[in-house]
């Protein structure tokens, strides 16, 4: 039997500077699992080996690579469907969804991101799912390419994740 709770942060690489060891505590062992370029359907497959370890909690950050070619509603629905399936298969695993973050490589996508997050918030509220409240992340929190978080953005997001982990 594990002494520390196991927490996975599964993400699509936008949060490349978030470190699991930095989020680990005396009672929680956090590990960041990054899947560069992953789309929502890919993440479903990537999660399978992680779920076999029966984690106590998962923070899921995905959708960044879908938003360019899919509607905001489709992206939000697909994310919620993945989380709902995990809940059904692993009811004791605490789940949280990290919202899509802004990007500066294509500013037009930010309207789609805002809409997807709005829909995601509504879905989460109606289904009793946890959508993390990520504030203060703006275009100054992105690297030069405008897709991934810089150190400032990673620090802000890490703090949000740490708050979730402290309360669970």
Predicted regions and their residues:
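A detector of helix-start/N-cap boundary segments at the beginnings of structured domains
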Residues: 4-6, 143-144
């Amino acid at each position: 039997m594990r002494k520390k709770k196991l927490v996975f942060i599964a993400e699509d690489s936008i949060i490349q500077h978030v470190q699991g060891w930095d989020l680990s505590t005396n009672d929680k062992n956090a590990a960041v699992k990054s899947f560069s370029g992953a789309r929502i359907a890919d993440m479903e497959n990537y999660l399978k080996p992680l779920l076999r370890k029966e984690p106590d909690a998962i923070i899921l950050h995905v959708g960044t690579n879908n938003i360019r070619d899919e509607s905001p509603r489709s992206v939000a629905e697909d994310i919620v469907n993945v989380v709902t399936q995990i809940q059904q298969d692993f009811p004791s695993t605490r789940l949280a969804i990290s919202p899509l973050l802004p990007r500066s490589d294509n500013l037009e996508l930010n309207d789609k991101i805002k809409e997807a997050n709005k829909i995601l918030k509504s879905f989460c509220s109606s289904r009793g799912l946890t959508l993390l409240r990520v504030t203060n992340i703006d275009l100054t929190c992105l690297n030069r390419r405008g897709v991934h978080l810089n150190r400032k953005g990673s620090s802000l997001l890490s703090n949000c994740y740490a708050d979730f982990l402290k309360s669970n």
